[in-house]
A protein has these predicted regions:
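Alpha/beta-hydrolase fold catalytic core
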Residues: 1-22, 44-46, 82, 86-87, ...
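Active-site loop/oxyanion-hole signature of alpha/beta-hydrolase fold enzymes
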Residues: 7, 36-93, 108, 257
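Active-site glycine-rich loops that stabilize anionic/oxyanionic intermediates
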Residues: 27-30, 95
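Flexible "cap/lid" loop of the alpha/beta hydrolase fold
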Residues: 99-107, 111-149
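Conserved alpha/beta-hydrolase catalytic His-Asp/Glu region
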Residues: 125-131, 142-204
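Short beta-strand/loop motif that positions the catalytic acidic residue
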Residues: 205, 211-213, 217
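Conserved alpha/beta-hydrolase "acid-adjacent" motif
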Residues: 218-224
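Catalytic active-site module of serine/aspartate enzymes centered on a nucleophile-bearing elbow/loop
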Residues: 235-266
């Protein structure tokens, strides 16, 4: 692991392997270690960069939590690429990370070679979902990460995988319970106020794009992935069977093969 102070915040990251850079952006409320199966498989042929977003993992907390905007997460990563002297790169993000890379494309479209969206969506939240993010943020600051983590583990992965893949479940709980409640809450509030990427960004994306989703994802169901594909000009959709919201951990062999096949083809 390494650290860099960029955009006014300390960002923790790993950089592994040689080749064309591939940047992997984690979801909420996780950290860079969610990409371990991908780092192992991809670093033979790609230069893999896995940052902890601000407020997550070992990265710093924003000094002004109320002033954090969703685009700050993307600016941090772009500044990290500047720090690493990486001009162009492939980009993959899961869930919130998928929206972070949409914002990265909005800010710096010429730097991105391809986009890989995993278990994410582009449109605005419904009023109920938006309000729910604020409610959850307040809850995390009051209760900490423990109760929330125990409650959502059966939605993060398929319920049967909690027992049939105990290593995956333990890893998820470790990440979630190890996340700063303040960092997680800041991200929820910032995400609630993001722009409409479906209307404002997707129509501008012409580079090769891969959309992936777990067949049993409860947070971002297959219909959301299909909506992405319908609104992208140069897109392939892959549905990972027997996986929930985190196919890169639940079915990492199928996930990794789909990513590598896509990157080789472009």
């Amino acid at each position: 692991m390494a650290k860099a102070t960029v955009n006014g915040i300390e960002i923790n990251y790993t950089a592994t392997g040689k080749g064309t850079p591939l940047v992997l952006i984690h979801g909420h409320p996780f950290d860079h270690t969610m990409w371990y199966p991908q780092v192992v498989d991809f670093s033979d042929t790609y230069h893999i960069i896995t940052p902890d977003l601000r407020g997550f993992g070992k990265s710093g907390l924003p000094a002004n939590s109320a002033g954090t905007k969703f685009e700050d997460y993307s600016t941090d990563v772009l500044c990290l690429m500047d720090y690493l002297k990486i001009d162009n790169f492939h980009l993959c993000g899961l869930s919130m990370g998928g929206q972070v890379i949409m914002e990265m494309f909005r800010q710096a479209p010429s730097r991105i070679k391809t986009l890989i969206f995993a278990d994410t969506f582009a449109g605005l939240d419904t009023p109920e979902v938006k309000q729910g993010r604020y409610v959850t943020a307040n809850r995390l600051e009051k209760e900490g990460m423990g109760p929330y983590s125990d409650e959502v583990i059966c939605k993060m992965i398929m319920p049967e995988h909690v027992t049939s893949r105990p290593g995956v479940a333990a890893h998820l709980l470790k990440m979630m319970k190890g996340t700063s409640p303040v960092g997680a809450a800041i991200a929820l509030r910032a995400r609630a106020e993001r722009i409409d990427y479906l209307a404002d960004v997707l129509p501008k994306i012409t580079i090769p794009t891969l959309v992936m989703v777990g067949r049993k994802d409860e947070f971002t169901p297959v219909a959301k992935a299909e909506e992405l594909k319908e609104n992208l000009q140069n897109c392939k959709l892959v549905i990972i069977e027997e996986a929930g919201h985190l196919p890169g951990l639940e079915q990492y062999e199928a996930f990794n093969k789909s990513v590598l096949d896509f990157l080789i083809a472009v």
